[in-house]
Structures are given as C-alpha cells and as structure tokens.
Amino acid sequence: MIIHPNFDPVAIHLGPLAVRWYGLMYLVGFIAAIVVGRIRLKLPYVAAQGWTAKDIDDMMFYGVLGTVLGGRLGYVLFYKADFYFSHPLDVFKVWEGGMSFHGGFLGVTLAMMLFAWQRKRHWLQVTDFVAPMVPLGLAAGRLGNFINGELWGRVTDPTAPWAMLFPGAMRDDAAWLPKHPELVEKWHLADVFMQYQMLPRHPSQLYEIALEGIALFFVLFLFARKPRPMGAISALFLIGYGLARFTVEFAREPDDFLGLLALGLSMGQWLSLPMILAGIAMMVWAYRRRAANAAA
C-alpha cells in the first residue's frame, strides 16, 4: 500500500498571502490551454478559418469566467442545493471548495456562445477550436485534487499495487467499516485499519488525470489535426469525457451527502450520460450535414 504524501495545500507563502496548490493548478490548466491553442494555430485549416493569438487570449477570459461561475453554480445546484438554499451567503465561500465539472462545462459552453456571437462565428466552430485545449486543464485540476488529498476513490483490496491510504479520509474510513462487513472480512480490513487508522482506496484522481486528461487530450488533438465536419470535434469531446468520467466514477467515492442514486450510479455518472448521448447525436448530425452539403 502507498500512503498519500499529505502535501501542504499551500504551495507558496507570500507574507500574509497564501497561494494554494489547487488555485495554482487552475493557472497551470489555463496556461496549458493557451499553449495548445497556439499550436493549433499552425494547422493550415485552422489558420484558414481566421483564428489568431488574440482570439485565444480573449477566449481565455470568457473561459475563466465560465469555468469559475459555472463550476460553482453547478456544484450548488447539482450537489448541495438544499444546503445552499438554506445558507445562501455560503455560495460565495469559494475558498472552502466546491466546484462541479458539469457546471463548469455548461458555464464555458455559454461563455463560448457569447464569444461566438460577438465575433460573428458559429458557436460550434468556436467549441471545435476550444475542445482540444480543455483536457490538459482538466488533468491539472485533478492533480490539484490529488495534492489536496481530496475526492479520493472507493475502498479497495489492500494487496492491489495501486491501493493508497488517504489521511484525509480517516473519519470516512471509520464510518465505512461497520457498513461493509463482508468486504472487511474478505480483505482483512480490520487489521489494516488497526495498524494505520486508514483504509486502502483507489487513487481515483490519478485515474481521472490519465483518462479525462492525458488520454482524451491525445484523442482530440490527433482527431483535430485534419478538417472535420463542424461539431464533430466538440461531439468527440462530449463522448470521450462522458465515457471517461462514467468509467472512473465506479472507482471514485460518491459524495457522502448524496451517495449512490438510482441504479447504483453516482451523480457524476448521471450527469455524464446526457453528455455521451448528446455527443453521439451531434457526431451523427455533423457527418450527415457534411454529406448532405456535398450532395447538394
């Protein structure tokens, strides 16, 4: 078993100010997006569409707003609506954590639609350009989660080479034991807990870095190297992210205030299903539209 390093959440101390790793990872993510965007400018078909470095800079401004506002509101509405409706001022306590990818995705989509309207472009042309820029930012965010020792995975067999002990999960581990006597006996978890006061878990943040971040980036980046029907790159992002997130959720610990929902699926899985279906529908539409235009 591997013990999580339990990093200091503060990366840099500047007198009374503290720069946290999670915030720093957001910065890394946005910088990575800019770098990928500038690399894409070198593709002939992208250059022919009139994209410029200034467009990327302006786009990032909209992207930051969409990510922060959408991510926060998505967390409030999708995950803890009852709490925040009772404590409305707590919505603004972003330093206490609480961001939702699916909310951030909707926020960025709306922000890109506004950007497209201002630049007189079709919004799918904008999202097709942006989609390959996103996954490395997602990977950076999940790395921030791992450094913080949060959003850990479900309890697993201690003999698994990837099993990890998370100090931040101690209270959850103690509460988990009496609820799962069969697994406690099967995996000899009582002995593990007696020795470490923790239980072995999946490092699901690392799985998300691998699938939602690195793998999805290469799939999108390679797919987008050639001209595709408008909407196809965006559709592949929806399908790829949705499938990656749906899969990893089987190893990720559900939010304790929600647990598992209908059919034993988590909130993250239920929110990913519409993404997958929308992506498939958009992909079919994109290629049929191109075929119809070619035949006209």
Swiss-Prot record:
One GO-annotated biological process of the protein: lipoprotein biosynthetic process
GO molecular function annotations of the record: phosphatidylglycerol-prolipoprotein diacylglyceryl transferase activity
Record bears the keyword Transmembrane helix: yes
Residues that hold a 1,2-diacyl-sn-glycero-3-phospho-(1'-sn-glycerol) according to the record: R142
EC number annotated for this UniProt entry: 2.5.1.145
A cellular component annotation (GO) from this entry: plasma membrane
Locations listed in the record: Cell inner membrane
Main localization (coarse): membrane
Keyword Cell membrane: yes
Membrane topology reported for the UniProt record: Multi-pass membrane protein
UniProt cross-references to InterPro entries, sorted A to Z: Lgt
Transmembrane segments: 17-37, 59-79, 97-117, 129-149, 204-224, 230-250, 257-277
Pathway stated in the Swiss-Prot or TrEMBL entry: Protein modification; lipoprotein biosynthesis (diacylglyceryl transfer)
Keywords in alphabetical order: Cell inner membrane, Cell membrane, Membrane, Transferase, Transmembrane, Transmembrane helix
Enzyme superclass (EC): transferase
Matches recorded under HAMAP family: Lgt
Family under the similarity heading: Belongs to the Lgt family.
Function description: Catalyzes the transfer of the diacylglyceryl group from phosphatidylglycerol to the sulfhydryl group of the N-terminal cysteine of a prolipoprotein, the first step in the formation of mature lipoproteins.
Name used for this protein in its record: Phosphatidylglycerol--prolipoprotein diacylglyceryl transferase
Gene source species: Burkholderia cenocepacia (strain HI2424)
